[in-house]
Amino acid sequence: MHIWRKTIALAFSTVLALSLSSCVNQHPAAPISAAEETRIIATSNATLKICDKLGLDLVAIPTTIGTVPERYQGLPEIGTAMAPDAEQIALLQPTDVIGPDTLAESIEPTDQAAGVPYTWIDLQSVKGMYDSIAMLGEKYGKHSEAQTLISQYEETLAEFHRAIKGVEAPRVLMLMGLPGAYIACTPNSYAGSLIDLAGAENVVQVDDEMNFVSWNTEELLALDPDVILLTAHGLPEQAMEMFSKEFSTNDIWKHFRAVQERQVYQLDYQIFGMSCTFDWPKALETLKEIIYDKTVEPYDAETAYAENKSGT
């Protein structure tokens, strides 16, 4: 089996730079005293929402298509999460720049040279996000806010697991579409980790820390998933068009039991994305409706492909 590599294609490496990084350890500094001035920058929409929930003041925000919390509207923008402007960040003289650790490998060397202090947080799983929240709460004296969020997380997860107790765990394959290609989500990716969190089995297992793999269809067929889930990253409309063509024109998919039994489903890429967000309960509820309740309409690739070809 062939592990996903950056060298497969330039387009892939650009879109997936964040997912190919090795795990970065968080190194929280000593707690900040009330007398110390803080100038914090958040570099992604996910970290922006965490800062808002913790009540942290910021001096700049990422350029994002997502909703910006009211408290941060009008602040300077420092570029997108995958390509922040290191020079602009340095000019703002931050005391801390908070970003997802999946971007550390591509961003850290440039910003280290500019003397920018970073705190990398783990958004590759729900647990990782709440561990990061606890760390930031400790660092910035937001213990109460952090504990409230952690308690809500524990209660929500316990309630979900009670709801699915005793049900048979299906075997699930999750594919993430890119313009012109797709990759399979391992349990080390956020989207892939949701499968196990929902009590199902992710059929894509690896021995290393890879978030995604690029296996051919014959290798995926051998995994014999009960359910196939489709999500997207980067130009999602193009990615879903790619899926409709792939499932309609590549005959090997007809041999997948999940396809034969109409157990292929399209997911909301905004919920099943690269980084954990506070929408994770919606993601679990969606998985429950698909793999346990069977209340979601399956994906109709042929209809979608015909509509794409006709331009409707």
PLM features: residue spans?
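Bacterial N-terminal signal peptides that target proteins for export
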Residues: M1-A11
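C-terminal motif of bacterial Sec signal peptides marking the signal peptidase cleavage site
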Residues: L18-S22
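Bacterial signal peptide processing site
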Residues: V24-H27
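Basic- and aromatic-lined ligand-binding clefts that recognize polyanionic substrates
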Residues: S33-L54, E145-E201, F272, E302-T312
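Structured C-terminal subdomain patch of bacterial secreted/periplasmic proteins
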Residues: T38-R39, G128-I133, E138, Q147, ...
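A short, structured surface patch at a secondary-structure boundary
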Residues: R39-T102
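Flexible loop/hinge segments that line or gate small-molecule binding clefts
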Residues: V68, L103-K139
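Short helices/loops that flank or line small-molecule/ion binding pockets
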Residues: A86-P94, A113-A114, S214-D224
